[in-house]
Amino acid sequence: MCIRDRDNVLWKPPGGKTLGFHQDAAYDDWLIPQTMMTCWMSLDDTSKETGTLEYIKGSHKWGLQPPKGEFHSPEDYKKELNIFAEKNNKQIQVTYVEVPAGGVSFHHGFTWHGSGINTSSNNRRAIVSHCVPSNAKFHPTNQGGTAKTYKKYKKENSDLLDEEYFPLLWESNSI
């Protein structure tokens, strides 16, 4: 079973800046279990030139690292990735997510990913859905990071995710 945690609409216009390498699940320390799956749906044809999504092959097996703070438009968008890889003796192999408009890519919440500058004359837009297991619930004590935003949806006296805000997308007996 799967619950939608949140959605994002992304727009990288021509000349649009970088997105620093990060792991999505690192920013969900307000959840137990702290894991997720991300669905990245492209609204435009993507390429390396449009600043498409970049994955690091096998990085979902490297374990979850603490969040590194702001990752929008850093000067060196691979800095945190390079620091982690060097410190932990990991090999970096970049995969560019090049899909046509309407194409979809899924990644594990532990996958290191980011994107470069859009050097093309085209927009790069996407809709992103982050999904968590149906047994996910609010962490009883974590209050920092994105918890400040999402704890406002917590019902009093319950750690369960309220379906009014976190809808059930799929369950095994729904087909």
Feature locations, PLM:
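Short, conserved beta-strand element in jelly-roll/cupin
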Residues: D29-K48, E98-V99, F106, H130-S134
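Short, P/G- and charge-enriched loop/turn segments at secondary-structure junctions
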Residues: D24-D29, I92-V94
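Short, glycine/charge-rich beta-strand/loop segments that flank catalytic centers
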Residues: R6-G15
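Short, small-residue-biased leader/transition segments that mark boundaries at the very start
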Residues: M1-I3
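Short acidic (Asp/Glu) patches
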Residues: P14-Y27
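Double-stranded beta-helix
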Residues: T46-W112
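Non-heme Fe(II)/2-oxoglutarate
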Residues: K68-E70, V104-F106, F110-I175
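Short, structured patches in soluble enzyme cores that scaffold and shape functional sites
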Residues: N8, Q23-A25, M41-D45, K57
